Amino acid sequence: MRTVDRPNEVHYDFEESCYVEGDSQSLVKVKAKSDPPARGGEQCAVLPVFQAAFLVQDVDTNSYMILNPATAQWFFTRPLGGCEMFVAKGSTRQDVLVIHSNLDRCRNKVGNLQEKGASVDEMMGRHPGYHLIARVYSEPPAAEKPAADAYMRGYERGHPGILTIAYNNQPPTTLQYFQFIGHYNDAQYWIFTVKGEIDGKVFGRIQVR
């Protein structure tokens, strides 16, 4: 279900629309419920442990979802190519709010970083039961990096304890999109992984403990 909280802010409820196949925490493939499972993988389509929540990316919007591991133990969103992800924790480590920020109204990277950070801070004010624990962002071009780094240092000071992870799609690194995958593991906490879609390089992990 899609609920527009306000302009540029949309809440998505979990719908049983996808599941995962794979053999490890990050080597998985998400499939629509309408897709037949691979031979031998029939259980993936029906067992709760394989169910996945998918967060839609909306244009110029902060899309968010509150995860429920009793319903789905995997989380996916659209591949990242400049968007940011924010993770907020509620009163328990099972209670997690995830935001896909696709605001892109500024002409420069530093402006985009500032706008996304400020908009999510404002949003958190409307969700007082949650606090931000992580932010995933794309590194800017070299010319903007000093100003962006200065902004991020100030952002981290204003958000004590927050984990920030940068992914890099600037040359000479591999030109690719990036996956943001969440898994509620056997130890009963969420782990989110940021990794390259082509080279598989892991840029960081977020553990919600």
Locate each region found by the language model:
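Active-site microenvironment for binding and transforming phosphate-containing groups
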Residues: 1-209
